[in-house]
Amino acid sequence: MVYTISGIRFPVLPSLHKSTLRCDRRASSHSFFLKNNSSSFSRTSLYAKFSRDSETKSSTIAESDKVLIPEDQDNSVSLADQLENPDITSEDAQNLEDLTMKDGNKYNIDESTSSYREVGDEKGSVTSSSLVDVNTDTQAKKTSVHSDKKVKVDKPKIIPPPGTGQKIYEIDPLLQAHRQHLDFRYGQYKRIREEIDKYEGGLDAFSRGYEKFGFTRSATGITYREWAPGAKSAALVGDFNNWNPNADVMTKDAFGVWEIFLPNNADGSPPIPHGSRVKIHMDTPSGIKDSIPAWIKFSVQAPGEIPYNGIYYDPPEEEKYVFKHPQPKRPQSIRIYESHIGMSSPEPKINTYANFRDDVLPRIKKLGYNAVQIMAIQEHSYYASFGYHVTNFFAPSSRFGTPEDLKSLIDRAHELGLLVLMDIVHSHSSNNTLDGLNMFDGTDGHYFHPGSRGYHWMWDSRLFNYGSWEVLRYLLSNARWWLDEYKFDGFRFDGVTSMMYTHHGLQVSFTGNYSEYFGLATDVEAVVYMMLVNDLIHGLFPEAVSIGEDVSGMPTFCLPTQDGGIGFNYRLHMAVADKWIELLKKQDEDWRMGDIVHTLTNRRWLEKCVVYAESHDQALVGDKTLAFWLMDKDMYDFMALDRPSTPLIDRGIALHKMIRLITMGLGGEGYLNFMGNEFGHPEWIDFPRGEQHLPNGKIVPGNNNSYDKCRRRFDLGDADYLRYHGMQEFDRAMQHLEERYGFMTSEHQYISRKNEGDRVIIFERDNLVFVFNFHWTNSYSDYKVGCLKPGKYKIVLDSDDTLFGGFNRLNHTAEYFTSEGWYDDRPRSFLVYAPSRTAVVYALADGVESEPIELSDGVESEPIELSVGVESEPIELSVEEAESEPIERSVEEVESETTQQSVEVESETTQQSVEVESETTQ
């Protein structure tokens, strides 16, 4: 690969003299050149295993694991050495004594209230982040000065310093073969942490860039700052000055930061009224342009206009939302309801934050989920991008309401005990130039990699340069902003695989060979960024959750950064959904139980997974949901209970329940469901879109901007006269089963049977025994089930219950007594009836009392009772249904009579003689 870098820019440092470097500052990177030449320079990457040459446009690739250094350079100069080298700084340093701010006041830093020092930083330093209204041209090395007024800054929260990074080798000895790469990666991470501590006052201060950049309000006026080193001139324009580019001209400092201070009006009112449209007018190498400020907090699209407009958002105190409820603690097992605000209405329209708060959140709580993951929060000008082509990273989407509406939604979720996770996009950015970050200052390599490396050819988007100091500030501050300002409880990071590899995971098959993860294709800069953002999240917000969307299976992904890992709490177990689609394209006879079990349990030791049978990806136009794969067009005509069912419907409903339960039961430590899929939402998602004319002349047909398939028909799941209702109630029972037993996070997991002949899978998780019979016709009487603990077992969940659209072939009052003797590598066993296409969960009943699971927090609903005791009843779900006639079923598909089980007699009857495999999974 060939990378060219046009120049270099140092981070903003209040303790530095002005730089006299004679080079272009349009590109920014952590990878600094080592020798300063007046005419040209080359620099060596300190992150990746290749060397970059900005003149020859060539790269030297190391055949070994060594980092190549050109002959005329060495790698002995650190970032700190370069920043402190007097040879590359100006001699005309100014200090901060008697410093007069642009608001006319004098300030000093009160060291008693502001130390900006983290663990491991013995000196500490005052940073630009603390000098909110300081002209960055007047910077000095002093940490305290004397003047007329004091600036009180809150003491920073403590983020633990880096550790040794060596524990990963104890956890996974296979990593030893790649120690050089991993130690190099950890060394880069430690170096950046140290430099952030030294020059920016620590990760806490560094991640509060929104207090310095963009619009900041003080008692005397408004300061606006923007990093745009490529711009030749800049001015702030908007409604407040009639869009006059000559009215409020900005000044540029030595580091490419443009600034202007607007004093209050004579009557004390702010110079820019709340709600005013604003943009930055720049003369750039690409021409004159008006851009939305990169740090804008709100943007809207005016009627009849295509580009968005930035909005100065600073409502009066009485209009600002005040959070009333504490954020919930992180649950042991996280059960996520993936959602999208705009398409959350049953009606064909764009829904609002307020409607979602009032209508959808109570539904999520009633279903038994404990977290809601919200997509498309960051502003995106193209609605059909599903929120993944972000244009304004700090602005919540105005399609759905105001920032205060979003805060109200999150506060209501917290009142209900729900975590709120944000689907955050830091993997790429919209390529829009008018209302996005692309070509912001007129240069190709501003926030992004220059040249082809900065473009994602499949997504048609721009790729961030994670080696840039200001990009790190921007993205880390962005994550901090959503947690701090809006009280989100964590993130699902989108497109992490694309970030971690220069090939972006495209046209690459990951086989599990470790060289695929720790080679030349690994983007170490991006991996280090993820380590930093996880440090930030877990250090400042210990209860927050970070989930990464990685399809590659990167080792160390969910191990702590102090141990050498990347630091996520969970990875998405993405292979499971693909496996189900693969199987649904086959005949039932071709399903292999061992294949299913292997896919579900193929997880890395000590690295937690959030598993799902399907997410929004499977619901998009061009794909199918599980329900549609299973039942197809029959869903249009045979889902009403007053109509006879069909074999396709019977099969589909049965397998839909089994697939979801075995996915939750065996696939991970967390579970995710996309809204509506709990009841088998029919059809696909298709956002409103018009006809598109591509540059190559091709035309992509639209859907006449229809919202018909961009909504969620929750009414289908609620209608007790439709078969969707039974599927929804089963999903609800699954969530409450996990809530009661916590089996997903239990350390005890044992797979005792995966029988290809019987099509039976049996496993233990916690004190539960799961029995799945995937056979399409065969039901088994007196089927022996191995177990660990002795005693009496009872049914606590039965997919064949009529409440869930089943045939009621099991006796829920039956008791199952264990008998001694090894079977399937278990010391005991009990006998059950295993009907075809059913999943049944048994719990040890002895000595355990049953208590109803109350749905509280303002959700009116009857409790769900899980039978965990001797005298308890099986699961009872509250439903709002009328009495319905018995459902006639196909004889070929089911057996209509219930076989009564003799559970006290130890007899082995009709089991087929097949090879039994047993397996322990950790």
UniProtKB/Swiss-Prot annotation:
It holds the Pfam family Alpha-amylase_C. Residues 1-47 form a transit peptide. Its main location: plastid. Residues 83-130, 870-922 are annotated as: Disordered. It is found in: Plastid, Chloroplast; Plastid, Amyloplast. GO terms for biological process: embryo development ending in seed dormancy; starch biosynthetic process. The active site is at D494 (nucleophile), E549 (proton donor). Its EC number is 2.4.1.18. Pathway: Glycan biosynthesis; starch biosynthesis. One of its GO terms (cellular component) is amyloplast. Keywords: Amyloplast, Chloroplast, Plastid, Transferase, Transit peptide. The keyword Heme does not apply. It catalyses: Transfers a segment of a (1->4)-alpha-D-glucan chain to a primary hydroxy group in a similar glucan chain. It comes from the Eukaryota. Residues 897-922 have a biased composition (Low complexity). Expressed in roots, leaves, stipules, pods and flowers. Disruption phenotype: Wrinkled seeds. Catalyzes the formation of the alpha-1,6-glucosidic linkages in starch by scission of a 1,4-alpha-linked oligosaccharide from growing alpha-1,4-glucan chains and the subsequent attachment of the oligosaccharide to the alpha-1,6 position. May preferentially transfer short chains during branching. Responsible for the synthesis of about 75% of the amylopectin found in the starch granules of mature embryos. Belongs to the glycosyl hydrolase 13 family. GlgB subfamily. Monomer. The wrinkled seeds phenotype (rr) studied by Mendel in 1866 is probably caused by an 800 bp insertion in the SBEI gene, leading to the loss of the last 61 amino acids of the protein and a complete absence of activity. This is 1,4-alpha-glucan-branching enzyme 1, chloroplastic/amyloplastic. It comes from Pisum sativum.
